[in-house]
Amino acid sequence: MSIINVMWSGGSPYASVHKVHQQILSQASPGTPVKTWLLQHSAPACLRELGQVEALKLSSRFLKGRGIWALSRPWRNCFFRKALLKNDARQVLIDGLGVARVLLPALRTLPHVRAVVIFHGSTRLQCKDVRLLRQFSGEQLTLCAVSQTLADSISADLKLPVVTLSSMLNPHTFEQQLLPRDQARQQLGIPAGTHQVFGAVGRLVDSKGFDTLLSAFAKTLVNHPDRLLIIIGEGAMRAELEAQVKALGLQGKVLLPGYVDNVASLYRAFDWVLIPSRAEGLGLVVQEAVIAGVPILASDLPVFYEQLGEAGNYVAVGDESAWARAIEASDALSTTEVAARQHASLDPEHAWLRFRQACTTVLSGL
């Protein structure tokens, strides 16, 4: 009997979600076959480590079943029901609400198959979503969220229990891949002699707040022209952010290298990691920076406080002036001391053990 991990797609925009599912599935009982279905395309390497990965290459119209495509829903449900039976599925790990809308209808006639839906971020629940999720018993369907903050929010909306699966990276595995500072800077093309290097990692989308960060960073260059900001990631806002860099005269002071495949190994290139997000379900960047020993400036979101507590250095969400002041003030702080406090607060080793135990419980259906 196997576990089927169902995700929407592969590719760099989904990298953090793939990491979380990989970490969860790594805690499955030894010998349990794990198969991954990507509803659309691409197969990330981290999921291949767990077992067979299949890209189903289904169209969005077929999957979403809107308009005239609603007529195809019975066939879609039949397709997935047969596929689950063929693969002797015992459990289905479902990536968020979008995939749940596709998969759960097929499980109505398969009461022996358990489903675990993992919520990675805030989502707009429609009335039909609530009805769908309430059709299943607690024995067949488990709802999980990657942080306590997110679990509380979704549970309040659904009026259903949501298990907190506080996602945590394996600190030992992550630390082994980290490059030394000089080597990491060389790979990123950082000029020698740069006074301070600030790093930000994430998709180039509105919720990440990089537009606010650019405006704030520009203000700090008046007194510290030898600073550098690198924003690693790709997304729909690239053209807008590039135009902002040009308008603010930040050419050469801000680098937008796009998606970098080995970004997890490069954190020690930074003096500080900046996380100006407007909203986050978890924020794996927090964990990656802490394990790398790099101090963090982050938006004052509850999900970041959940991880860093009083050791966090927080800045008001979307407040350009506050971000400029915080970046300016960072020069007077001991990065070693700040990083040590944040590491002690997150306590990656014990957080990883708690996460492993929680995953084992969820996957076993206890």
What are the functions of these language-model segments?
Residues 259, 278:
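Aromatic "clamp/platform" in nucleotide-sugar-dependent glycosyltransferases that forms part
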Residues 15-23, 196, 200-219, 236-242:
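A conserved mid-protein helix/loop that constitutes part of the nucleotide-sugar donor-binding site
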Residues 175-191:
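A short helix/loop element that forms part of the nucleotide-sugar donor recognition site in Leloir-type
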Residues 334-363:
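A charged, aromatic-enriched C-terminal amphipathic alpha-helix characteristic of glycosyltransferases
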Residues 298, 313-321, 327-334:
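Conserved acidic donor-binding segment of nucleotide-sugar-dependent glycosyltransferases
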Residues 6-72:
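N-terminal strand-loop element at the rim of the active site
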Residues 139-164, 169-174:
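A short, active-site helix/loop in glycosyltransferases that binds the activated sugar's phosphate group
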Residues 94-101:
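Short His-centered aromatic/hydrophobic patch
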